[in-house]
Amino acid sequence: VKIVIDPGIAIETNSFPIPLFNRLVLVDKYERKIRNAVKDCDVAVITHYHYDHHIPEGELYNGKKLLIKHPEKNINKSQKKRAKYFLDLVRGNEIFYADNNELKFGSTKIRFTKPLWHGTRGTKLGFVVGVIIENKEKIFFTSDIDGPYIEEYADMIVEEKPEILIIDGPATYLLGYIMSYENLKKSIKNLKKIVEKTDFKTMLLDHHLLRDYRYRDLLHEVYETGEKLGKNVITAAEYNNKKPAVIEGYKRYGPTKWKTWEKHDTHFV
């Protein structure tokens, strides 16, 4: 069975070190790739209704089984509205509500977590669902848990023992604005715990984290823990034998909002 998770895309903010035109070109390039992947899949999973996680078009999903975050339970007002709009577009599809559910397609089992906070407890961003796919290997896609800031979510990941872990990391590009240094400390602590206690083959640490060219310095304790233990902690770009665009952009075009910074050490916070 061919599965696509969260087929959506959004343009980066101006803190991303690539000119607007180049960012638009990248969006166009990867949106075409995403659309082709959806056309070629059997099952599409949508963990929540932010537009970087789904394209709200009906025709795109024709004939696909849709496994989606519940559109009415554990959902904020904005996403509830988007979910209703999306469901109106895909009425003819076979639809399953994902929250805390389990389905099997041939030899592939897809399990979903209970609704998880999109960041800190009580956040206005609402909830997402994590995805566990089991076949020859176990893959855990956390969706947007923003860190994780919440230790319970780190423990859940450790207990699942995935071979491949895809995790979004903290939104450090919002550090000192929407994201606090205390939450960065929690995220680093929880990521280190996951690295130390999970015998994964690969951990893809990406999404929110890779919007900030300082990411390796801010999370150096996580990367150093991985290196010390021989764990493969990499970005999605590196998994595909490419260099992260945020680093390439910084090298080519220079800094945006962060001109200087230091490595972040949690014991000083």
Q: Where in the sequence are the language-model features?
A:
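Active-site neighborhood of phospho(di)ester-bond hydrolases with catalytic His/Asp-centered motifs
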Residues: V4-G8, C41-D52, I68-K69, F140-I145, ...
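Active-site environment of divalent metal-dependent phosphoester hydrolases
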Residues: Y49-I55, K73-N76, D146-E151, A171-G176, ...
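A short acidic, amphipathic alpha-helical/loop segment
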Residues: P56-E59, E152-I157, L218
